[in-house]
Amino acid sequence: VISKWGARTIAHETPYTLEQVRRLASFSYAAGDQGAAISSGSFLTQGMIVAPCSMRTLAAIATGQGDHLIHRAADVVLKERRKLVLAVRETPLHEIHLENMLKLSRMGVSIMPPVPAFYHRPATLEEVVDHTAMRLLDQCGIHVDAAPRWSGEMTAVK
């Protein structure tokens, strides 16, 4: 599901078209499709990652609003006690943002800002993105080796 603002983010921040991104997915649903499979708890999923997660979406999820498929699908994930991961990227944060994050965290939601890691000494932006994506997938129990993992040893300077 790609929101209107998600589509704008893709256009502004990536070299991909919206259609190219949709083709990467096994399934794609319109943001207004409240009848989509993911809007029902009987449709089995491992969980859900909202990336990026706006403060509007965070607030809607925290308050149980379901006027958008992303909000409804997140609500379903919560009620079914599945894994929900929110990649919030707003800064700085004010008290309402933090209260909404705390409320969701207490419900078992993983709040995971896409903060880059540098211990693996990434040489490209793609390596930074791959590492963040790998960490997000790890949260849902989906393990891919898209980037080096911390081994306890310092990486030599490239």
Q: What are the residue ranges of the model-derived segments?
A:
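A cross-family phosphate/adenosyl-ligand binding-site feature
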Residues: 1-85, 91-158
